[in-house]
């Protein structure tokens, strides 16, 4: 275990994973803030508890926040799995740093541009992150 913790590739992976986990927590918080700000709830008990409006449809601002959150849930856990396998498979420190930091920065930028409705930047950031995971997956298969 000590050997793994002292491995530079693992340290990079762990740092990036922690940053992405915090980012996911902040995205969930952002969704909650938007729900509270608009006082719109799809659960009647929440509407009652927070003196808000109950409805079957999400408020557009909340729906946008939920799409950002869902996008994270579709992409970041894949990084957690593939990145860990890649590091455990013996990735070099430099290759691990390149893939992990590229993915992490792409996801942080994706978050910013998604919050601000900026296309084509959102698609570009998504694609950069996608290629990072794909690159690690291919390296795992080839090793």
Identify what each model region corresponds to.
Residues 1-30:
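Long, highly hydrophobic alpha-helical transmembrane signal-anchor segments
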Residues 70-85:
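Core segments of transmembrane alpha-helices
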Residues 82-93, 141:
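Juxtamembrane "helix exit" motif at the C-terminal ends of alpha-helical transmembrane segments
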Residues 106-131:
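Interfacial loop-to-transmembrane junctions
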Residues 29-67:
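Cytosolic, membrane-interface loops and tails of multi-pass inner-membrane proteins
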Residues 93-102:
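Structural signature of hydrophobic alpha-helical transmembrane segments
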Residues 136-143:
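Juxtamembrane boundary at the C-terminal end of a transmembrane helix
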Residues 22-38, 108-111:
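Transmembrane alpha-helical segments that form the membrane-embedded catalytic/substrate-channel core
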């Amino acid at each position: 275990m000590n050997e793994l913790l002292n491995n530079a590739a693992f340290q990079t992976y762990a740092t990036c994973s922690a940053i992405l986990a915090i980012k996911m927590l902040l995205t969930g918080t952002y969704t909650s803030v938007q729900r509270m700000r608009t006082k719109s709830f799809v659960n009647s008990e929440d509407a009652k508890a927070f003196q808000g409006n109950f409805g079957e449809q999400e408020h557009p601002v909340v729906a946008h926040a939920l799409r950002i959150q869902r996008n994270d849930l579709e992409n970041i856990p894949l990084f957690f799995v593939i990145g860990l396998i890649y590091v455990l498979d013996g990735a070099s420190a430099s290759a691990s740093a390149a893939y992990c930091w590229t993915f992490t920065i792409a996801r942080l930028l994706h978050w910013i541009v998604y919050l601000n409705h900026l296309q084509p930047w959102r698609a570009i950031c998504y694609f950069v992150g996608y290629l990072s995971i794909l690159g690690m997956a291919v390296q795992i298969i080839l090793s």
